Amino acid sequence: KPAVVEQARTPHQNAAQAAAKPGATDGAELIAQAFAEQHSDVQVSGSGKVHRTLPDDTQGSRHQRFIMKLSNGQTVLVAHNIDLAPRIPRLQRGDTVGFSGEYEYNAQGGVIHWTHHDPAGRHADGWLEHNGQRYQ
């Protein structure tokens, strides 16, 4: 059964805390660098706006999918495992989503996944935040 949705202390709190640190960004800078250098397996966090929602990927583990636009204009696919974490209900274009996950390079802009807890405890836990709720 997916993990319980947690109430975030404030919407996008972790992203806001990261952005408040000297030299930190909303995650767009690190993702842009990983894309330019074609790096994968990069732990990232920040926030972006939903550019487009996509049908769920139902092959293998089920994933809620959407395209997110970052503050620098780059778009990335978010693939959120809904077998391990709750789906974000009523997600719409223009919504702000905070994230912590792993970036994987592809020529279309990349993918952010591992936006959930790791039941085996071998990988950094990730999450998504939407309207004050954390999904992990």
Predicted regions and their residues:
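OB-fold and OB-like single-stranded nucleic-acid-recognition modules
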Residues: K1-Q136
